[in-house]
């Protein structure tokens, strides 16, 4: 047993360990990893788990609470407050006489720092906890051989979570599996593995139990014949292997360490960054001007400097990251309650922006419960003697690869008829696995008399290319053109009824070889057909209708026969008038392909790479493309799409490639996801437009006040408190509702619209800020230093209330409070902040920061100014919508 951690460290990833695992004889490898040919005991697994930890890759560094707290503290807002605390300490405590020391400002500002930091930390912490919880709801599994503590002989085939694997485990691999750890192959059968995630090469390569001489001294370690690395996936075939590295000790884990935390920026990230930079650019231009104007007109450069810094804080969108995170996190939690798991938070926004959904047919539009309806002879007569069924059963039963839905249907049908004993008279000799180029698979069987035959089933057109004969009425005849035509007519009839048809062929062998290859699939005898029915989901038609109503076009991308795809598509309400097949696409020019993918809704007989290519072509036309699929052949398309959607029962590689996982195969959740994505995006846009327009207007207000007033319009502490209160009022935006009209179509970032919005709406607040200046100057005679605090109190309240009211004005294109009201959290928070803002000048806290109670005659003026502000904003909103055809 492994008693010392130093014995474990040598298992960390390094080239020597990999080469040892590859080159050493099996017995040596078993001894080195202290395991047996039956696997590990449960006790040993527990020990190794405690030493190694879970078998997981940290794609992004987990954020520790202390680090998150530090990041919440390090931001422009807290930075300026900290500077103000230091200055206050120097001016009010250190340089003051003992009797004149004043700690009030220090205590107040320090309280603001603590509140601001905690607010951001809590939101970030909750978002991370939610994301981690959602990730745990989707698990990939593998089959492992383990030696029970009370049994002998092992228990092969136990399904466990990939996280529970430890070095020394023996695992079973089959088509569709993600390689769960770094593995030395000890047994294999036609094992083809895709290493594209590691090497970038799209072609799959074959792996063997033994290392070839050519690989002994040359080549990259990823090319080793008997080593499979975590992150690659099984395309076809099967294998047994011993795990020699897990988690961060794997080859993939080493790569992940170097890139952890450096996720590539998405269009969504870039949009947020553009908004932030736009606001910061305005701030960098205006703040120096404010500093110079105040310094020149007031003569106090230190005060002007502190005021300019405070203005900078007010103009900095410091809450934007928190609002975005809170919105996305809330959207993910809402979707999880609807049986939809979000692996990547940014995918929620893409869900809302999606205007084209490409979907596979089988298991997505259909029920994923295929039934074998008919098994018929070549001449179309029923297979009353079950000869066709028997051959189909052998093919499905003896294959070791991934049994697809049609294999399961055959096995289930034979079980219903009580014919499972058919296989007892035969033994398997070899198999030629399925691949998406040949679109067929073969097994070689031998009966008790030593007679061998190869049995092949696959897509009809591909099967006809390897058949030279056909069996009619028990007699084998050359396969003539008329017979081929008859076969194709029969298939079309079945396809028109929505049935999928496979052809079945066989050939007897005298050879006693034990290894067979694709070259043996020739001169075969066509013996019959299998017709399967996979009816559409009950929810498919309604879901597609609702997606269309919400501006999402649905396209079907299938590897199946064109007639079958059209039949199913018609039943679920998809337009089938324009369609194209994979072979037709191959022969098109790039320009013709581009036109075809835009025009057509039905794509059939596609290869996996063609699915991916179609998505790329659609994206080039500025579409946001989603893809829904659950098979091995869907993995490339899932990765290529803007939002990959799969189901919890999908093969590992499909789940790994997806951004969204549906826990139930109910297409109605797609509509929920689209709407939640648009709500999330809409609420983010609300904050962005509120902040942008408010900040843009405040720049002009501050500049005007700085130029014409003999004193500061507000003290730095006033600006900071006002900014903090406004920020708090925005924290409920993620819980706001969106108007139904906004949710009716896809939404994407538009930086040009944001600039227009700022220019149109921003200056409105400046008009009424200046009106407030005039009221305070002329009506309340705030024209000298003795009335400075009254002036500042008047603008403090008006500025805060107008900023908070704009939340309700901007959140909807309708008339606020009358035609559209905010959610109760938004209403409660905004009006509470407004009440707090009005009360502050009347409190001792207000006095401590230089504010003074306002005369009651001020408030009618305030109401008039705010009402006028709302009316003018609503009028300009209507005009803006009429000119630019949009609001949010």
Predicted regions and their residues:
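Non-lumenal N-terminal regulatory segments of integral membrane proteins
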Residues: 1-166, 171-179, 184-270, 274-277, ...
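Membrane-embedded transport module
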Residues: 290, 294, 321, 330, ...
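Hydrophobic alpha-helical transmembrane segments
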Residues: 107-139, 146, 263-359, 530, ...
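Helix-interface capping motifs at the ends of transmembrane segments in multi-pass membrane proteins
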Residues: 83-108, 151, 278-316, 329, ...
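Residue-level signature of catalytic and energy-coupling elements of molecular machines
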Residues: 45, 73, 127, 142, ...
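Soluble-to-membrane junctions at the N-terminal ends of transmembrane alpha-helices
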Residues: 54-86, 128, 218-227, 258-285, ...
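Cytosolic catalytic regions of ATP/NTP-dependent phosphoryl-transfer enzymes
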Residues: 227-235, 350-525, 532, 545-546, ...
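Alpha-helical transmembrane segments of multi-pass membrane proteins
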Residues: 74-94, 109-120, 139-140, 277-295, ...
